UniProtKB/Swiss-Prot annotation:
Record GO biological process: anaphase-promoting complex-dependent catabolic process; cell division; meiotic cell cycle; positive regulation of mitotic metaphase/anaphase transition; protein K11-linked ubiquitination; regulation of meiotic cell cycle; regulation of mitotic cell cycle
Pathway membership, UniProt: Protein modification; protein ubiquitination
Superkingdom of the source species: Eukaryota
PROSITE patterns linked to this entry: TPR
Disruption-associated phenotype: RNAi-mediated knockdown results in both viable and inviable embryos, but eventually animals display germline maintenance defects and become sterile. Double RNAi-mediated knockdown and/or mutagenesis with such-1 results in increased embryonic lethality and the production of one-cell arrested embryos.
Name of this chain's protein: Protein gfi-3
Subunit structure: The APC/C complex is probably composed of at least 12 subunits: apc-2, apc-10, apc-11, cdc-26, emb-1, emb-27, emb-30, mat-1, mat-2, mat-3, such-1 and gfi-3.
UniProt tissue specificity: Expressed in gut cells and mature sperm stored in the spermatheca.
Coiled-coil region(s): 346-366
TPR repeats: 526-559, 637-670
Function: Probable component of the anaphase promoting complex/cyclosome (APC/C), a cell cycle-regulated E3 ubiquitin ligase that controls progression through mitosis and the G1 phase of the cell cycle. The APC/C complex acts by mediating ubiquitination and subsequent degradation of target proteins. Required for the metaphase to anaphase transition in meiosis.
Assigned GO CC terms: anaphase-promoting complex
């Protein structure tokens, strides 16, 4: 029976990623081949031959000593890193300064250059194998097994080694040779012509390296320097944008890098960062997608497989995990929270499939950032608005990392972590951010928590080693900014001032000449400066607050970092509104309210309602407040307090009492330091206006300690005025409270309130008052008249 023919075995080859991506790894842009670099290469080769010899022949002169090699390498490093092209005349001067001609180094170098200039030799960039092996080949005139070979090698020992395979000089030479070997015959002809012209020219060389017919600046003329420039630009944008290029200029160079150096895929990442700073979200997302698409293949580490298949690239799944996180971050920054959540869900699923702990933790942190804060510049709780998108509470707080061995069960992937130490530092950083997010959630829910020892874990208690990525400083800065913000949130202005000043004082420049030692000008430090201004304004020092704001405007302009600048805009609007309100300048107040509209509806509407009430439109102001849909606990309390104050000013005391009761019921369920005294002070003021003076003094006594410790400048002023008026109307001595009131506004921050204090003093010294004094009364009336001329209008302290 005839056997059936065997079925053919068809081997289906996988996609050739090298061809699809344009042979990126074989088309790297090496060191540009310029006359100065060719001359440096020739000089290096002559120095090696002088030290080692040529082929099997030993050197005529004795080898260089370690001290001599150190001096030689200093000069070679200077020539290799030169940014400008030297003329042949200048190069000759350098060689004469660098080398005494006892070994005829200069003579041999000049002879080689003169041959090229005379057309007697072409440029040949090659080096003997002995440069890499540091071993002489056997003398062909002697038998191969002759013991003389071994004896001569032992006699020379290690002194013939010229350089290390890990040295900068070695890597520079490999880059130059890599670029030269890819040159076409026409390019080789151009190199020879340029070199001949360089040798014969008596003036400074005008030669510029070109790549594909386009001149490239030195910092991006090869893949290595382009990648280094991209990394430095990303670093400076995140730390201090003043030391980076202008964004439009950086975008121009970034696109040149993308076009001319396809292996530098980080150029797309830099473009995405720049587009975020330029507020172009669509272009940023497009660049981020390009970055991860191009990074979906990497260099094959299995050289046996690469040699068999002749393919350098292999696919990687890392972008499937990390790409959604960065894209979601861009969506969050520009307010697209729904898309951000969808992307983060995808990243979490990919991380769970591949058991990547770092990716899983990063996605969790970003998910909580979206759900808790979004991209708001203020500590406001918006959790209820996004509750339908949240499943179960993800656990971002885990066991604290105290040692690198605590990090287990992690499969390292991607370029973000190249060692276990970096894994440990990055996960510790994510854990610290997780703790801070949970603390922010607690603060937004109306709780004051003073345990901060785990907040800045990476920077304080977590051993991060040298902290080369400055993760510890960044986390510590976020923790310090959160501390000072929470203190401002609870009326602890003096403590917040100390915390903010310490934070800013530690952010100093240690070396004026080194940009890497420059102070940080990032968002956490902007928040620290803003909190310093808030703390100054909270105690009535508006001049110092305005000076701080002006300094912040110079340090954080919008064209450098709009994310930091928005804190400055909010701070300036809040403080200037309060300053203009105290001076009865309602027109200026209205312009400041517009600056808050884009950042916080709550802050904007509260101030709009206050202006409407001051203009006598109480009903319209109450409607504005009732139209607010706020879930932030402190925001709801403030709405009730503001509504109650408006009812108090319009003498609708029953409605005011109801609003204050609602505010107090909410405030008593929080642990905020200042909110209960603030509510009770307003209740006391309402009772005073209603004629219930005994009950008013009882409430004032209850909230006295809280107001003195946590009350702002205006809060204390209203408290003292309420106490003074109640004491006077009850026939008691109010001078202690009037003295405190007048001392509080002695610098003229609130002229209308000063008039109110003077009117109380006048009522006290009136003929029918408790302490009649005609002389004192006339003095007070004279002061009142002068103030009225400078600041007309009444004091609307009942609305505050």
């Amino acid at each position: 029976m005839q056997k059936a023919a065997p079925r053919p075995i068809i081997k289906r080859s996988y996609l050739n990623l090298d061809a699809i991506f344009g042979h990126v790894f074989s088309n790297l842009t090496g060191e540009p081949v310029t006359p100065t670099k060719i001359a440096t290469f020739y000089l290096l080769r002559i120095l090696f031959q002088t030290h080692f010899g040529f082929r099997h022949k030993r050197a005529y002169y004795k080898p260089f000593s370690p001290a001599e090699k150190e001096r030689i390498f200093h000069w070679l490093y200077a020539l290799m890193t030169s940014v400008v092209e030297l003329s042949y005349k200048d190069f000759r001067i350098v060689t004469r300064l660098a080398f005494d001609d006892g070994r005829e180094v200069c003579k041999n170098f000049y002879a080689a250059m003169e041959k090229i200039g005379a057309g007697m030799a072409d440029v040949t960039l090659n080096v003997e194998d002995e440069f890499y092996t540091n071993k002489h080949p056997k003398d062909p005139k002697l038998p191969a097994n002759d013991t003389v070979h071994e004896a001569m090698d032992l006699a020379r020992g290690d002194i013939i080694q010229f350089s290390s395979n890990h040295s900068f000089m070695y890597r520079w030479m490999k880059r130059l040779l890599a670029q030269y070997t890819k040159s076409t015959p026409s390019e080789v002809f151009q190199i020879n012509a340029a070199m001949k012209s360089w040798v014969l020219s008596a003036v400074e060389s005008k030669y510029h390296p070109e790549f594909k017919g386009e001149y490239l600046p030195h910092f991006i003329d090869c893949s290595v320097r382009a990648r280094d420039w991209v990394a430095k630009s990303i670093y400076f944008i995140q730390k201090n944008p003043r030391f980076a290029f202008q964004y439009n200029e950086m975008l121009h160079y970034t696109r040149i890098v993308q076009k001319r150096h396809p292996d530098v895929v980080e150029g797309f990442l830099l473009e995405a960062i720049v587009q975020v700073q330029l507020k172009d979200s669509s272009s940023a997302i497009k660049a981020m997608k390009s970055f991860f698409e191009l990074s979906m293949f990497e260099l094959n580490e299995n050289m046996v497989h690469a040699a068999k298949t002749h393919r350098l690239a292999v696919p990687t799944q890392t972008p499937l995990m990390y790409a959604p996180i960065l894209q979601a971050r861009i969506c969050r920054i520009f307010g697209d929270y729904q898309m951000a959540r969808l992307l983060l869900h995808e990243s979490l699923q990919q991380a769970q499939l591949r058991n990547d702990e770092i990716c899983h933790q990063m996605a969790n942190i970003e998910m909580h950032t979206v759900d808790i804060l979004g991209c708001r510049a203020l500590l406001e709780d918006n959790n209820e608005k996004t509750a339908k998108h949240i499943e179960n509470e993800r656990r971002v707080q885990r066991k604290a990392l105290l040692h690198i061995d605590d990090l287990h069960g992690h499969t390292r992937s991607g370029p973000c972590c190249l060692s276990s130490e970096e894994d440990f530092e990055l996960v510790a950083e994510m854990d610290s951010y997780g703790k801070m997010l949970m603390l922010m959630k607690i603060i937004a829910e109306g709780n004051y928590k003073l345990i901060y020892d785990r907040v800045a874990e990476t920077g304080i208690t977590c051993p991060v080693g040298n902290d080369l990525g400055e993760r510890g400083r960044k986390v510590a800065a976020y923790g310090a900014a959160l501390i000072s913000s929470n203190m401002i949130h609870n009326g602890m202005y003096h403590q917040a001032k100390c915390a903010a000043e310490n934070m800013l004082a530690n952010n100093c420049r240690t070396d004026e000449t080194d940009p890497f030692q420059a102070p940080f000008q990032a968002e956490p430090w902007a928040i620290g400066a803003v909190n310093l201004s808030y703390s100054q304004a909270g105690v009535g020092n508006y001049d110092a607050a305005l000076r701080t704001i002006e300094e912040m405007r110079q340090n954080y302009p919008e064209e450098l970092s709009w994310q930091s600048n928005r804190h400055v805009v909010i701070c300036a609007a809040v403080i200037n509104f309060e300053r203009f309100l105290l001076k009865n300048d309602y027109k200026a107040c209205a312009s400041e309210v517009l600056n808050l509209a884009a950042h916080s509806e709550l802050e904007c509407k509260l101030r709009q309602a206050l202006l409407l009430a001051a203009a006598g439109k109480e009903r319209a102001s109450v409607e504005v407040l009732e139209g607010l849909n706020v879930v932030d606990i402190r925001g709801r309390i403030r709405i009730h307090m503001q509504t109650g104050c408006i009812y108090t000013a319009s003498q609708e005391f029953r409605k005011a009492a109801r609003e204050f009761a609602d505010a107090l019921s909410l405030a008593e369920n929080t642990t905020l330091k200042d909110i209960v005294p603030m509510v009770k002070r307003r209740q006391a003021t309402m009772l005073m206006c209603h004629g219930q003076y005994v009950e008013c003094l009882k409430l004032l006594k209850e909230c006295n300690e809280g107001i003195e410790q946590f009350g702002s400048f205006t809060e204390k002023a209203c408290y003292y005025m309420t106490a003074a008026r109640c004491h006077r109307l009850l026939g008691k001595d109010p001078r202690m409270w009037l003295k405190k009131s007048r001392a509080l506004v002695r610098n003229g921050q609130w002229p209308a309130f000063t008039k109110l204090v003077l009117s109380e003093i006048a009522a006290l010294h009136d003929v029918k008052g408790l302490m009649p004094d005609e002389n004192r009364l006339s003095q007070i009336c004279e002061q009142f008249g002068k103030l009225t001329a400078d600041c007309p209008g009444r004091c609307e302290w009942l609305l505050i």
